[in-house]
Regions:
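Conserved active-site alpha-helix within GNAT-family acetyltransferase domains
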Residues: 95-108, 205, 228-246
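Short hydrophobic beta-strand segments in globular cytosolic domains
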Residues: 52, 172, 244-245
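Conserved acetyl-CoA-binding loop-helix of GNAT-fold acetyltransferases
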Residues: 72-82, 194, 200-217, 234-239
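Conserved donor-binding loop and adjoining core beta-sheet/short helix segment
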Residues: 2-5, 16, 22-82, 175-186, ...
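Acyl-donor-binding surface of acyltransferase catalytic domains
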Residues: 50-51, 58-126, 251
Length: 259
């Protein structure tokens, strides 16, 4: 079958392909939202008119974010001829890293676990949490900046769902969302963090539980990511009812001068 490359602009066509592995492709599906779609370049490999591989380059952040999906052998021409990013953060399946390394030198490689929640398996964890809003943005930024390495942007608070725990007027724990897409029925939990002095008290569980409960009330599919080596966090999520869907790889890549 003859392989060809094309640029994708039709959301319906893109979504149809991403839906073949919806829970792996949740971030890419979220990028179909109008505010994010304008930052995206989509390219695909096709055989006999059927999409077999996809490369998304999201240019709304620096450096670019690249998502790969589909047959590894059909990703090669996309990485070689369609993707122009000199450097980027990549997300791909473990079996796709070999073809990626042909074109990019990878560092900061980490295996992540995509965890998903069956609503019937959800086990709520109650605690002294409250909903966070715009007035809490500076507290959130301070908590993340001073004590953690958490990527947070204020728009996530405006558009998402965040809960927190306070002690003596200070925000000491929080959980929120990376992305909420009601159009595509997705809620991606993230930005979970507890002040070092307040760990071991179950605050991560109660904050995450509150976020999940609100997302489920909106009939959204709920997912999150956790590092494969972060067993402690994975146990927290498992107790809430999450289970591992698939491993994937995150890495920073710099394009090789010659391939």
């Amino acid at each position: 079958m003859v392989l060809s490359i094309k640029r994708l602009e039709d959301k319906a066509e893109i979504y149809a392909f991403l839906s073949e592995d919806r829970l792996y492709a949740v971030y890419a599906i979220g990028d179909l939202e109008p505010a994010l779609f304008r930052h995206c370049d989509w390219h695909a490999s096709t055989r006999n008119g059927r999409l077999t591989a996809l490369c998304l380059c999201f240019k709304g952040l620096v450096p670019d974010r690249v998502f790969l999906m589909g047959a590894s052998e059909d990703l090669a021409p996309l990485l070689d001829g369609s993707l122009e990013a000199p450097r980027a953060y990549f997300a791909c399946l473990p079996e796709q890293t070999s073809v990626l390394r042909r074109f990019y030198s990878l560092t900061r490689t980490e295996v992540m676990l995509r965890m998903v929640l069956d609503p019937q398996e959800f086990v709520p964890c109650d605690g002294p949490v409250h909903r966070l809003g715009a007035r809490h943005v500076h507290q959130l930024q301070d908590l993340y900046r001073r004590y953690g390495d958490v990527a947070f942007a204020p728009y996530q608070l405006d558009q998402g769902v965040f809960y927190g725990v306070e002690q003596d007027g200070e925000l000491v724990a929080t959980a929120g969302t990376h992305l909420v897409s009601r159009a595509y029925s997705l809620g991606i939990v993230g930005n979970v963090f507890t002040h070092p002095d307040y760990r071991g008290l179950g605050y991560a569980s109660v904050c995450t539980s509150a976020v999940v409960e609100e997302l489920l009330a909106q009939s959204l599919d709920v997912v999150l990511n956790v590092g494969q080596t972060n067993g402690r966090a994975a146990k927290v999520y498992e107790r809430l009812g999450f289970h591992v869907y698939c491993p994937f790889v995150e890495a920073f890549g710099v394009r090789r001068e010659s391939v």
